[in-house]
Curated annotation (Swiss-Prot):
Expressed by the venom gland. It comes from the Eukaryota. It comes from Dendroaspis jamesoni kaimosae (Eastern Jameson's mamba). This is Toxin S5C1. Inhibits ADP-induced platelet aggregation and inhibits the binding of purified platelet fibrinogen receptor alpha-IIb/beta-3 (ITGA2B/ITGB3) to immobilized fibrinogen. InterPro entries: Snake_toxin-like_sf.
Length: 61
């Protein structure tokens, strides 16, 4: 599975292992007018909260 990332600070594509899943996170600043979306690999053993499937953002491909 390949997850496509939309954040410039991470690789554009990330290989996920079989037990990993894709997640989507949304960052907003204090005035809620700066929204950045990112996709990546999530493993249940990690500490990333709230994994979300984001097929519209080309995750879970």
């Amino acid at each position: 599975r390949i997850c496509y990332n939309h954040l410039g600070t991470k690789p554009p594509t990330t290989e996920c292992t079989q037990e990993d899943s894709c997640y989507k996170n949304i960052w907003r600043n204090i005035t809620f007018d700066n929204i950045r979306r990112g996709c990546g690999c999530f493993t249940p053993r990690g500490d990333m909260p709230g994994p979300y499937c984001c097929e519209s953002d080309k995750c879970n491909l």
